[in-house]
Design a protein with these regions (language model features):
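Alpha-helical protein-protein interaction scaffolds
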Residues: 61-63, 366-370
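Primarily extracellular Gram-negative trimeric autotransporter adhesin
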Residues: 3, 20-22, 26, 159-179, ...
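Extracellular beta-solenoid/beta-roll
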Residues: 1-100, 104, 109-163
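Outer membrane beta-barrel translocator domains of Type V secretion systems
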Residues: 164-349, 354-356, 360-362, 450, ...
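Short glycine/serine/proline-enriched coil/turn segments at secondary-structure junctions
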Residues: 80-84, 110-113, 249, 340-342, ...
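Short beta-strand-to-coil "C-cap" segments at the C-terminal boundary of structured domains/repeats
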Residues: 105, 124-126, 162-166, 242, ...
Length: 500
């Protein structure tokens, strides 16, 4: 087809090109130009992606001069590595002003592979034609698979679509979901220091409220196989209760169960330090514990098994992606207390933790997202230094008239224990793949961010018996990563322990 003379589209006007079109005059565009009929609802989908397998014939629009007045040219492109697209040809003249290019990815479902060479030529300057530096720009993000595609002007005056060296923001965002879920599970399980433990023969129920900040430093980013940089907060409520306390062959045995509900929200950064998005996780957990304590020596061992249901939502500027899954955790911890003085105790501790995670696969606006089974292991070595009060309530001296003798205690008379717990935590053997791609062969990209690393952890706490059967505990802590991609942050917790 052909266009005779000067063609001018005012704002709000549109023109549909059927086949190759040559304009014998200039084109001035403030409206919309469409290659083929892309205005039908079945042809254009959100986020510049068309699904389907119908063969596509690409076309050219040729003109001597194009003056952009904020108008848009809607073009089709196949992001399957074939470098095929509609083209705008500037023949011997100039492209000036400002023209927006809107691309629709056509062909097989959500094609998306890395471009090769100079990229996909979409504006072809021929016979000495020139194009101003700002003559063209993308009107909307173009994404497929793991890639962002950008519009670039080369020294030959042509304009090309290229996949960025850096992956699209959703790559580190989705990869961080594995890390965030497992970080939360480990925090919830904690160590023995996260319980207010009162010695005695009676069963007890404990209610804990915990919150804190958690993050990962930039250690090279997703492109170098590291956990993406992130920073966020969490909060949880945990209720646990003893089911059985008994003596067996010189050992004190305690078993119980716990349940917890929590939420975490983490901001994730791209490899270049820009914001990738936010991941939110609502989690519900059930667990059980077994404690064995050697009566004469005090040597103890804690065994914990925990399962957590995660409901996660990752939000970026271009996508809202949801995934659900299950996290599993097993922990074995042991310690042996030594009395330094009558009221001071030193207790070396060692803890091993294994974690697993499985998240559901899904799809966002640019392709599929698949998660491999995640797992990681931790070893914590440290010691606990603190007072060694037997927490006997005794008789108080308060002169206040009270209903119960057990409340006749001044604050300074309450039985109190304090403790500090420095540790080194080594995370190793971390696994967990996240794959993104489309139906196109060669589009699949797999990312395996490592969570291996070492951190230093310091916890401190205080517990006071305020009634014969009630103990209150508070604690705070800080973890600092010294190598690799281990987590760091701070936490605080308050615990109410009631025996019966």
């Amino acid at each position: 087809g052909s266009l005779s003379g000067r063609t001018q589209l005012s704002k709000g006007a549109s023109m549909v090109l059927n086949g190759d079109v040559v304009s014998t005059g200039d084109i001035v565009n403030a409206g919309e130009i469409y290659f083929d009929n892309q205005t039908t609802p079945d042809a254009v989908l959100s986020r510049a992606v068309v699904k389907g397998n119908a063969p596509v014939t690409f076309h050219k629009l040729t003109t001597s001069n194009l003056t952009g007045q904020g108008g848009t040219i809607n073009m089709r492109v196949s992001l399957d590595g074939s470098n095929a697209s509609d083209q705008l040809v500037i023949n011997g003249g100039q492209a000036t002003g400002k023209t927006w290019l809107a691309f629709t990815n056509v062909g097989n479902s959500n094609l998306g592979v890395a471009t090769s060479g100079q990229g996909i030529r979409v504006v072809d300057a021929q016979n000495g034609a020139t194009t101003e530096e700002g003559a063209f720009a993308l009107s909307r993000p173009l994404q497929a698979g793991a890639f962002n595609y950008t519009l670039n002007r080369d020294s030959d005056e042509d304009w090309y679509l290229r996949s960025e060296n850096a992956y699209r923001a959703e790559v580190p965002l989705y990869a961080s979901m594995l890390t965030q879920a497992m970080d939360y599970d480990r925090i919830l399980a904690g160590s023995r220091s996260h319980q207010t433990s009162v010695s005695g023969e009676n069963n007890s129920v404990r209610l804990s409220i915990q919150g804190g900040h958690l993050g990962h430093d930039n250690n090279g980013g997703i492109a170098r196989g590291a956990t993406p940089e992130s920073s966020g907060s969490y909060g949880l409520v945990r209720l646990e209760g003893d089911l059985l306390r008994t003596e067996v062959a010189g050992m004190s045995l305690t078993t119980g169960v716990y349940g917890a509900a929590g939420h975490s929200s983490v901001d994730v950064k791209d490899d270049d330090g820009s914001r990738a998005g936010t991941v939110r996780d609502d989690a519900g957990s059930l667990g059980g514990y077994l404690n064995l304590t050697h009566t004469s020596s005090g040597l103890w061992a804690d065994i914990v098994a925990q399962g957590t249901r995660h409901s996660m939502k990752a939000s970026s500027d271009n996508n809202d992606f949801r995934a659900r899954g299950w996290g599993w955790l097993g922990s074995l911890e042991t310690g042996l207390p030594f009395s330094i003085t009558d009221n001071l105790m030193l207790e070396p501790q060692l803890q091993y933790t294994w974690q697993g995670l499985s998240l559901d696969d899904g799809q966002d606006n640019a392709g599929y997202v698949k998660f491999g089974h995640g797992s990681t292991q931790h070893v914590r070595a440290g010691f606990r230094l603190g007072s060694h009060n037997d927490m006997t309530f005794g008789e108080g001296t308060s002169s206040r008239d009270t209903l119960r003798d057990s409340t006749k205690h001044r604050v300074r008379e309450l039985p109190v224990n304090w403790w500090v717990q420095p540790s080194v935590i080594r995370t190793f053997s971390s696994r967990g793949d996240m794959s993104m791609g489309t139906a196109a062969a060669g589009s699949n990209m797999t990312f395996s961010p490592s969570r291996n690393g070492t951190s230093l952890d310091l916890q401190a706490g205080l517990e006071a018996r305020v009634r014969e059967n009630i103990t209150l505990g508070v604690q705070a802590g800080y973890a600092h990563s010294v190598s690799g991609s281990s987590a760091e942050g701070y936490n605080g917790q308050a615990t109410l322990n009631v025996t019966f």
